[in-house]
A protein has these predicted regions:
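Active-site anion-handling motifs in enzyme catalytic cores
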Residues: 1-260
Length: 260
């Protein structure tokens, strides 16, 4: 089985991308990166990401993929498509917004696979004094200015070598507070109970707003784009800290191990 995700054949991956190979390896299934495709490979699974749109499906189809398996992927931007025109199985999509935009059957489960990380990689928090700034990969600029505004102690680069993911995951989970505008940094913080806020400064890109709606509607938390650490801490304490998240075991239970 092939697995397609952004930068899947690179040594350095975006933070959220690491979740795809980690979960696949956790289940011990036989899989390869899409970049290793041979003419005999005709099936592909899509897990973490916001690329569930027409261009992705069509490009994969043109490369010889005939059967698609979706477990957690969500709609971000791009054109919608009629799923009935493809041989495509939906085991899990990211949220209700994705289901609505693609007009998918209501019985398809929802949830982002990132939320199962504490189940497959348990970490006992040992809180450090680090206040981390972990911006989206497109917002990793003007760090000196941002440090003055946000008063963080440590910068967390979301572009991480494959062999450093678990080390960086521990750093994130053990931090005192996280300031971010990366969706999967936010998801991991929620999943592990790490205090965090979503902060967007002037000039920073708000990447794929619909993906944020997908996730935060699923959790039931009112998203706020904060402009300072103090505003973010207040949002965390009032909106997030005591808010329960849906049971994530059901996400793990939907994994289609039988297709491998």
């Amino acid at each position: 089985m092939l697995a397609w995700y952004w930068r899947e054949n690179e040594r350095i991956l975006n933070f959220g991308e690491h979740i795809t190979p980690y979960i696949l390896n956790y289940f011990g299934v036989n899989w390869r990166n899409y970049s290793e495709k041979t003419p005999q490979d005709t099936e592909c699974i899509l897990i973490i990401g916001s690329e569930l749109h027409l261009a992705t499906i069509e490009n994969l189809k043109k490369s010889g993929i005939k059967k698609f398996h979706i477990w957690g992927q969500g709609k971000g931007t791009g054109q919608t498509f009629d799923y009935r025109n493809y041989d495509i199985n939906f085991y899990l999509v990211r949220g209700e917004t994705t289901k609505q935009e693609l007009k998918l059957p209501q019985n398809i489960p929802t949830g982002d696979p990132g939320f199962v990380m504490p189940l497959v990689c348990p970490i006992e928090r040992q809180i450090s004094k680090q206040i981390i700034y972990a911006p989206h990969h497109s917002n990793r600029n003007n760090l000196n200015t941002k440090k003055q505004i946000l008063q963080y102690t440590d910068y967390f680069d979301v572009m991480i070598p494959r062999d450093k993911f678990i080390e960086k995951l521990h750093q994130l989970v053990n931090s005192e507070f996280v300031i971010t505008n990366s969706l999967h940094i936010s998801i991991i913080c929620i999943a592990y109970g790490v205090p965090f806020c979503v902060c967007l400064l002037k000039g920073e890109k708000y990447n794929y707003p619909t993906k944020w709606i997908d996730v935060f509607d699923w959790i039931g938390i009112k998203l706020k784009l904060c402009a300072s650490k103090e505003e973010g801490m207040d949002w965390w304490n009032t909106e997030v800290k005591n808010h329960p998240i849906p049971n994530t075991q059901h996400i793990l239970n939907t994994f289609p191990k039988h297709i491998f």
